[in-house]
UniProtKB/Swiss-Prot annotation:
Family of this protein: Belongs to the DnaJ family.
Needed cofactors: Zn(2+)
Gene: dnaJ
Location of this chain's protein in the cell: Cytoplasm
Binding site for Zn(2+) 1: 146, 149, 203, 206
Phylogenetic placement of the source organism: Bacteria, Bacillati, Bacillota, Clostridia, Eubacteriales
CXXCXGXG motif repeat locations: 146-153, 163-170, 189-196, 203-210
Protein name: Chaperone protein DnaJ
Domain notes: The J domain is necessary and sufficient to stimulate DnaK ATPase activity. Zinc center 1 plays an important role in the autonomous, DnaK-independent chaperone activity of DnaJ. Zinc center 2 is essential for interaction with DnaK and for DnaJ activity.
GO cellular component: cytoplasm
Amino acid sequence: MASKDYYEVLGLSKGASDDEIKKAYRKLAMKYHPDRNQGNKEAEEKFKDINEAYQVLSDPQKKANYDQFGSADFNGGGFGGFGGGGFSGMGGFEDIFDSFFGGGFSSRRRNGPERGADLEYTVSLTFEEAVFGVEKEISITRNEKCDTCAGSGAKPGTDSKTCDKCGGTGQVRVQRNTPLGSFVSTSTCDKCGGSGKVIDEPCTTCHGKGTVRKNKKIKINIPAGVDTGNVLPLRGQGEPGKNGGPNGDLYINIRVSSHKNFERRGFDIYIKEHISFGKAVLGTEITVPTVDGSVKYKIPAGTQSGTTFRLKGKGVPRVNGHGRGNQYVKVIVDVPKAINEKQKAALIAFMEASGEKLGSDLGKETIVDKIKKSFK
């Protein structure tokens, strides 16, 4: 560590204020704490470096000496006045961490109750199931307490013993000597894996784990109005806790299939309905499909293509139970691509009656028409 820049370790520039040092330490210590990075040796070493840097930079006298001489001078022996024990007796950095976070992580080192891990499961729903709600039965695989050993991990009739390496704490303390003095750090005990206990005769069913993998069927009530991206928490349905800790939670991720006719936007439903040119001009009554069934709706005369009408309360029920969204019907007026002579004559008459001027070629006999007549 002596070859490293303590400021750089905390992501700071030299001369950083006390508040900046504290904020940087808090952020990095939470990120690299062993409890959040179990089995990650790189994160464990990073955590040690972070605490070592903070022990120096948080102490005014040590910080002043460090700022004056720099880490390179320590390596060259220019700081020999401190010797190897200038800062001995500093204690473990877990005390520093606990002073910041109230001992929230220390309970694990003392083998206190530990909450079980959370689980996730994705449920696929049809459009209608999401709108009206549905009961689903899912099957998940999770750890369950071993029935053979009642979760102890030890063979029936035997018991676990306190780890003789860590004394039951689950952590071992390691002293590191640097030019700034002796630093005491802790790491997970490699003999008991942090449990503080060792099992001489493990259970033959769970092989000492205390848990076994089992498939479990769970019925879940999915409320009306859910949509893709919604997450439903099922409390206590996750992995079992340790040392009497609570179970984790199961989070149900919702995924809704699209519909061939309906488009959902929030709690509103959108649909397109096609009508003919004549019906748009004269008005008509159409049958509109909704999630509740078909309804009749009158289209007024002179409706323009793209006009949108609202069917109040025909949308998706709100998850909180306060009413429903609306359904919006967008009318598309279909213009015929080809018409016969009778239809053409009627349209020309309509335009003339409306006072519209015909185009230069509209309604006139074409050359092709004249040629056809000459052969009749």
